[in-house]
């Protein structure tokens, strides 16, 4: 969402709904993004939505992702699961921060390569 601005509708969903992980909330707050009020969504509730892209970020999600609309490009990027990291709270937060940074790098590149080319150069004039 951050890198695409208003140029794209962005959804986040998983194979099941669950409470937002507090390490994820803390990690995102450290990056000045408040996700504390967001709710998780089940991908099954979005199967009637037409998507240009569906991006899966773990191998389990890739295997469970339902078929989407025709023309939808599926992209898979496997990020490590920070929930799998044991140790102290500091170790766990560090794992979330590393994955957050990896996802940020991917999101920036994805928007630059796939979304920005679709935006007319004179977008300000069209608004």
Positions of the model-derived regions?
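Phosphate-binding/catalytic loops
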Residues: 65-127
């Amino acid at each position: 969402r951050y890198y695409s601005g208003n140029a794209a509708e962005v959804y986040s969903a998983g194979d099941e709904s669950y409470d937002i992980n507090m390490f994820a909330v803390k990690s995102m707050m450290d990056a000045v993004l408040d996700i504390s009020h967001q709710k998780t969504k089940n991908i099954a509730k979005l199967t009637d939505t037409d998507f240009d892209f569906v991006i899966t970020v773990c191998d389990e999600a890739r295997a469970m992702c339902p078929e989407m609309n025709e023309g939808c490009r599926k992209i898979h990027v496997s990020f490590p699961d920070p929930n799998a990291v044991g140790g102290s709270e500091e170790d766990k937060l560090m794992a979330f921060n590393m994955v957050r940074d990896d996802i940020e790098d991917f999101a920036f590149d994805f928007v630059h390569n796939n979304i920005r080319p679709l935006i007319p150069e004179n977008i300000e004039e069209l608004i």
